[in-house]
Amino acid sequence: MSWLRTSPLRQSLTRNSGSSGSGNSSATTTLRQRPIDAATDCDPRACYDSFCKHWQQAHEIIQHPGPPTHDDVLGVVSHLDYMVTLLLVELHHCNKVSLPTADSAPPAAPCLEYLLSENLLDKLYEWASTTGRYANAVRLEQLKLYELLVSHSRHQLLCHEPFLRPLLKILASSQGEIFPPDLEKRLVILLNQLCVVLMQNVHLLDLFFFSAQTQVQEQIQNGSLAAPKSGTTTNFIIFSLLIPYVHREGSLGHQARDALLLCMALSQKNSNIGHYIAQYSSICPLLVTGLGGLYSRLPNSIEISSIDWHRITPDDVTEIPELTLFMNALEFCNAVVQVAHEMIKQQLLDFMYQGFIVPVLGPAILQTNIDSQISAMSYLDLILRSITEPGLMRAFVKFLLDTEKFDGERILDALVERLHSPDANLCMVTMALFDTLLGLHCEDLMLELLLKYLLPGKHVPISHRHKINKIDPYLNTTEFFLDLTPDVMKRARDLARPKSVQDQVDPAAATAPLAVMLPSLPSPVMSKTIGANWNYYGHYTGDSLYANVQAYLFEAHSRIAQCQRDCAKWANSYRYQKWPRQGQARANAHALELAKQFFSEFASAAPMAAAGTSDLGEKQLDSLQSIGESSGYESFKWRPADEDAEGIDVTTTTATSDTDLEHNNSSSIGSGRRDSWRISHSTRNELLLTDLDFSEDLFAQGTVSLGPFLNAIWSKLQTFTSNSLYVNLHLTGLITRLAWYPLPLIHSLLLRSDIAITSDTPSFHQVLRMLKQQIDAELPVAENSLEIIDVARSYLIDREFRLVNARKITDNAPMHQQHQQQQLQHTTNPTQQQQAQQRSTYATLSAATPVQASPTSAYDPFRRSDNKRRSISKSISSMFSRRSTSSTAATNTNTASSGLSQIYAFFTGAASTLVGGNNGEVSARGAAQEQSRGNTCETSLSTAPRQEAQTAVVSSSNSSIGGSTQTLSATHSSSTLHGVESGLQTGSFNSEPVSLDSVASMGIIANTSGTERSRDLALCAVLLDEWLKELAAIALEQSVVLVTEQLL
């Protein structure tokens, strides 16, 4: 209650206290001179006498005839201030307010009892209504008094008419009024306290319902608080007073929204509240229109200051005031949907869809300008990651799939088209948005993106469909993925193993082609950074997740389990089933007759059918079985003769029924071949050809499409070696998220190398083979290649540590340094404001600079050109400190690449500037890494976008090597828009900051071996190697999940 000591009227009234005729007692004078606490010594009798005397003097002023003068108002306010102080002292010494009864002992709170018995509050209100221009000053003191009494007495006083009646009067008179800020603050605080009390005492809700204004005045004057007559419009006075402050900024808006949420929660307990809010209040349209207005104030173009920026993070929200206000309003709408009555919830969802989502978000996303598209999709991604209520989420999903609101064009289709964009920033933002959409585990979205193209099974040849639900091939898929590792990465893995491990290699492995080809290749000089702190290919000794297969398995298990729990709530299982339900037998009888007639005509028309020999009949059967895959990419693949004769179970596909029908029309087929496909005579007549569409399945397999979404992903994957590093990180993360779904139909595309895919584009496994062949051809196993591979590997690991440390330093920054940064942001100098907004730990990218992670930049994580040594703390500060935009822009005009040349020079010592004066830098880097070992969060190398809560291995605050940092809650954050704020800057150390992934030149560009193309391929090889390990881990975990399902 700081207002007791810093009241705006206390100082002005001090001079007039003697002339006002107030005789102050010694106890009151003592109380005014020191703070009030529980240990304050006071005489209860003296306090009571002083309280009564102050009221008598105030009452004398109130009884003066004529309008109140300035001195009269000051005198009453002064006496009222003293009375509040005495009441506060009394209530501090009362553990509980106990109102007197007829046979009770003397009251424990005599001042409070006198206040109620003499109707002081009512008399004070009546006099305040006549003060004219001084009404706000008197009202402010009244609100302070009510706030004090409500906060200390809770609900006890609300039950008594001498307190409730003037409270209702002052609240009713506040409707429709415009008050100064200090009065608004006191009013909202009082309303918030009343909501808290009502939430704990629901039976008091009826005390705050009023009828029309005229009827309210009549009830108050008559002293009756009876319920209003039927048919009159009710008014929840507390809720009505809070509505104008719902979109206010600062603490006032927060308190008003908190109080409104309590009212919404009360609607669940009292249906009258819910009916009133839904039918008679304007809260729902006010929320939606305010949300649309706040969205229109958002920046139409986001300044991208980082090469790997792809989404808005919580740090960005706090740095952009307009975005902060919008997110506050959105989170409030989400909370209302969560706690409000069903009528309020449904009304708000309808207004949200018709008043904000469709008319505001729709046109924003469909803009043609690339910068506007990036910003609109980033805002949509942030919205989807922020809302948690299923009802609100369904509204956004409906928006993405709606075909009627935008001239027949779906928003989802427009987003898929942007995956083909050559602009790297737009492509990364789009993939980040789809990563969020896939992370929702929404059945409708998955059906539109993938499942409706896969459910017919036409992407799988007829002879392979019985393999879809089998489990054993998943283990072979693991070996398949590991075999796709580029040869140069296999050689690098062998060289990274300890010598004792290399000596124990199986002699039979010497006959392998790679072992024969590389017996005389000299071992290159590996990176100087290989040590106990980093792990390589199974030897996990550090904090990096590089090559940590155990971490991949653990993460895959957690992600698959979460996805399985969410998908278990779907309306359909989306399992490929050969046998239809029994209820569909009669409905499909006509289709069966047409199928039999087709086979009969096909057999009679064939020239070889007349021969009647068993050999020709068997050959005809084989040719019919191969029709489904004759025009695809697997048409020339050799198949064993008994491949189609594997055991059949209830999950086999239409290959069984097709062969059974062919058996009915070919009496010359051998008995052995015939019996292997026979089910039984009793069930053969019930077989239905549910999956065989003769017009499309038999003759048009080569034109089967997997859908625009998968086609866009596959086309992006085919250009893997020419994409930027960050696009590839998001691409691999998106495909990995698809592989987490426990759906065999999706596994047939991603995790089943034994299933041939017949489509109009190369299959996923064929693309992986092509990537391996391309890397092996352009990056042969040689000493130079291995050196570049080591540089690329070291660059990615070092980048992982730098991102994690940057996030950690931001989280651990001292509060006073954050306060200094806030002061810089609120400075009045326009030049300083511009510099404060433009400073970032990320280097500013020129708009004309291609976003390509090529190893030709002069990036150096520590300044190597300085002659003097620096301490460890200064080196860390230099790494994460800020730099002016002008210097960054100047350097960007000289170089723009990924930075592997400087990293390579740093690790191998090839640059001429490293020959001296660098011991201090090396030790600083080693110490900085050693400092980060204990607390460095583990991250995933190959999967950049992450959104769910992390497991014990993958921490929730981690940042992936793709540049996305994990969120601290259920939603996920990524690298910040304006960079990571460093808390290590000091006034005496003015070093230029270094970007985490800077493309700016920061010294002499080191000469490295190999071309730019080879260095790009090295990055792709390292990333592909890690991604294949992750896919292998997912295949293993999916097999365990499927086995568990069958056992259960």
UniProtKB/Swiss-Prot annotation:
Keyword Coiled coil: no
The entry's keywords: Phosphoprotein
InterPro entries cross-referenced by the UniProt entry: FHIP, FHIP_C, FHIP_KELAA_motif
Keyword Transit peptide: no
Biased composition (Polar residues): 1-15, 839-857, 929-954
Compositional bias of kind Low complexity: 16-26, 816-838, 955-978
Region of interest called Disordered, as start-end residue ranges on this chain: 1-32, 652-675, 813-871, 924-984
Pfam families in alphabetical order: DUF5917, KELAA, RAI16-like
PTM-bearing positions, type Phosphoserine: 500
Family per similarity comment: Belongs to the FHIP family.
PANTHER family, per database record: FHIP FAMILY PROTEIN CG3558, RAI16 PROTEIN-RELATED
Protein name: FHIP family protein GJ17503
Species: Drosophila virilis
Source species taxonomy: Eukaryota, Metazoa, Ecdysozoa, Arthropoda, Hexapoda
